[in-house]
């Protein structure tokens, strides 16, 4: 279980987060939603171990987070892939750093590429792939080291609407099949409502958790209900509009 308690943080000398607490249990997909500048990415970087909080505690399975670790796989908004490596060797990169044998990391990387729908593209270079395919490589690379927690920082924000929905479906399929703890950062309200088993709404910066919502639309997809049927369901539309209203309410506080 991920446990974040009483987290305070600064970014570039300014307050970014104030007293943020959250938990992610095994099999839970938590989405953090908020406007630009609310500290969403700072929160993810703290959990990933890339930054140190001003105050508060972060633990994963009761072990304090003190720096980056293979226990926490990260998928970046800009993919963070190595252009001089082909697809399969990008996926192998973390395994290579961990000291896995060449044969075993190739087997693992090919398995992950198959999981994300990229079988047959292992020897393509990154510049030969579409944006959605590059994000699939990023997800495969993060999963290859078998992390306890998967962290995704606005991974689908630069994709077109059709590809974004495909990637949302892929993420829910991975969540269903692996049972991993997942934390996703987004500013897209429909995406947040569709994916989250728990949705945390952050206030404009410095970010504080102002709403916690339990949702089941992602679970419905994982159980076989089509994405389009879910997103056109009046219940989904009503919840999306409710969250939109809460977001606008937070923005109006600043005016």
UniProtKB/Swiss-Prot annotation:
Q: Which is one Pfam family of this protein? A: ABC_tran
Coarsely, its chief localization is membrane
GO MF term list: ABC-type taurine transporter transporter activity; ATP binding; ATP hydrolysis activity
Q: Which GO terms describe its cellular component?
A: plasma membrane
What is the membrane topology here? Answer: Peripheral membrane protein
Role this protein plays: Part of the ABC transporter complex TauABC involved in taurine import. Responsible for energy coupling to the transport system.
What's the protein called, per UniProt? Answer: Taurine import ATP-binding protein TauB
Q: Which organism is it from?
A: Yersinia pestis
